[in-house]
Every structure is written in C-alpha cells, then in structure tokens.
Amino acid sequence: MRKNRWMMGLAALAVISCGVEEVGRRPEVNREDIWTGPGMNAGNGSREICYITCFDYPEGYDWRTDPQKGSVKCSLTVFADGLPMMKVPVGDEYQVSPDPDMHRMIDGHLYTDYCTGSETVIKKDGKTVLRYPASEVLCGMVVKGDTIYTLGHSRHGDGFAYRRNGEIIIERFSGRTFGRLHYDDGRICFAFTEPIISENETIERYYHCADGDISQAALRDDVKKVWDIISYKGDISYIASLTGVEKPVLFSDGRMCALVMPQNAEPLSFSMMPGEEHLFWEGLFKYQDHTVASALWLSPERCVSFEEGMVANSCFVSGDGIYCAFNPAALGGLIYRAGEEFAMPAGYAVMGAGCGAVVNGIFHLGLSSLEGGCPKLWKDGKLELLEIHGYIASVTAG
C-alpha cells in the first residue's frame, strides 16, 4: 500500500532565466544551423552537469494537443546547469522529431533520430552524422568515440537490427529485443527473443549479445515466460514464470528466488535496473477491477507497492536506490526518492520516460504544466522555473 508519510519540501522557488528570446534569434542560414549559448561552457570538470532538454513552442500555441505536430515552428532546447546550451529547430523539414523519446544526451552532446519513411537519420548537435536505408524505432544508443551503436525495431513489421554507424552487425526479421542497449563488464550488451517453429509449435528462444557475439540463454525447461533478461556483472539474470509455481521467480548470481508480490495482482511487465551492488526492478500489475499499479523491488523479499492507478514513470537506479515519479491519479502525483515519498506539485506531471536524474547527489526531476504554463525542475523538494513555452522532455547527468 502507498505509504502515509508525505514529505512536503517544496520551498525555495527559484527562477532560471533561459534567454529564450535571444536564443530564438538564430539566423536562418540553412536547415541544420543551430544556436549555441553560454551553457556550452558549463562545468569545470570536477562536478556533474545537469542537462535538460525541452520542447519550446511559439507563445499562444497549445503544445498539449499539438494540432500542427511536425509542422509548427518548434525548437529542441538544451540547458546545461540552468544555462541555455543550444537550440535545434524541430519539424519534418529539419528532420528532427517532436517526439520526446527520439533524442538523448550522451557525453554532453544531443543525439536525435528521425524517420523519413524509408531512412533513419541520426544527428549530433543538430548536424547529420549518419543515415541508413531502414525505417526503425531506436530503443538504444551507445557512443564510443566516433562510433555510434544503435538498436532499432522495424517500423513496418517484426524484427530488429543492431548497427555500427548504420551498418548492420546483427539483424533479425522476427522476434524482439528487451528494449535496452547498455554496458556491462566493459561490453555493449542486449538481449532478445526469437520464435522458433518446432513440430507445429512455436517456441520462444532467448539470446544474449555482448559486443556482437550471440549466445543462447540457458534457461530451465519449466520456464513458461521470461519477463525480462539482462546481463549484470558478466552473468545473465532474468525474471520468469515457471510451470507449477504461482509467483514469478528471479534467477540471478546462480540463485533462484520467488518474488514477494502485491496481493490479488496479475503481472503485466517487469523491468530490471542494475545498481552498483545488486539488481532492482519495477513491475506493472493489473487488479481484478482492471485497474493497474506499479511496484518496486529492492530485493526479491522487499517489495514497495502503490495504490491502484499509481504507475511509475521515469524510473531509474542511482547508486543503490530507486528514483521515479507517479503522475497525478486520484490522490495526486507522487515523487519517490530512494525510499522517501514527496507530493508532486499540483498541476504538474512528468511528460517523458527519462525526466529524472541524480546530479551531484541531488534528485532532479523535470515537471511540466498540465495547464500549459512554464515547466519546473524539482531538486530534492526545491523548484526552479524554466521560462519556456513547452515541456521538459529529459533530464540527464553528465
């Protein structure tokens, strides 16, 4: 059940002047021209930098319904420690998407992906760095020097491709990945499943890829369904349902543990998150009245469940703590900070899947106005206003 303690540290409202008017005066030299500002020099190398990406729309435009999506004059603005860093024009003519899940900050650079219908275009800081002849939804990107690794699902059917600078390393025309491309033990890893037809029966086989080398995951014969699978500290860990076992089970570090579960709840999904010392995970459940809710696990025996209707957003692990947000439901929104709960400011919500980060030990969460006002940055209970007309799409530590 949802905890009763509410920590209301919402004082010290500060205003960050982002200089949007100055940023907006970018000369229209060519479509890939961008504006750069004082945020390019943020940080001195001794502390982490907080990068915020926002979509900034013309004054008076209803960005919540976005009736002219893809054609309205819009900018993807990046802030570094509260200072405007760059502004990239958004729209079909610029091949920069207004979707919040089609950009990310990596090593202080803005990477965007865009689909033309026949090609995928990737840009770095507003400049095209590669394009390849496939229409893909990217679910992961890793950058090593000048090399860009991507994991993408086909927009026109089943299958996926793992690429290096647009060139195919691994391609499958059926199956799916588990939605993450990440480092583990110094290797770039991901997991996927592929259907195998055997004697008129379709069987799911599960695989792991590390630096392009594929190995089949060794699972028990009584596995009915694998909910999630990940490489952690060089070994394969997974959550599965077994024949004859009521509760889902975690297999990790050579051990099998049944999960403590919310009562009268049917699992819909699990997502594992690696911590410094052990794994954490988040689950989504359906109750008998068809309402849904999230739960968080600190270990197989330690489950934090929430009231029906409370669904986790922007969930991540920093150090060995879980951080996430729950957008407003019947009892209002909730911010979860490594075991502590805070009331989300009324009238605000999280608009993207990656709107939270711990920067220099402080939880930063991007909150956007449900009424169309300016967004705010929540910093361990304090609020900072960003004077833009739009919403926060991501918050990243760098």
Label every model-predicted segment.
Residues 9, 15-47:
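Bacterial Sec-dependent N-terminal signal peptides
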Residues 357, 364-365, 374-398:
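Blade-level signature of beta-propeller repeat domains, shared across WD40, Kelch, NHL, RCC1
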Residues 1-7:
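Bacterial N-terminal signal peptides that target proteins for export
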Residues 37-39, 43-75, 95-101:
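Beta-strand-rich domains and repeat architectures in extracellular enzymes and scaffolds
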Residues 47-57, 112-116, 150-154, 190-194, ...:
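Recurrent small/Gly-Pro-centered beta-turn motifs in extracellular repeat architectures
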Residues 59-76, 117-121, 156-161, 196-207, ...:
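Structural motif
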Residues 84-92, 127-132, 167-172, 213-220, ...:
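A short beta-strand motif characteristic of beta-propeller blades
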Residues 95-105, 135-145, 175-185, 223-232, ...:
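Repeated scaffold domains used in trafficking and secretory/extracellular systems
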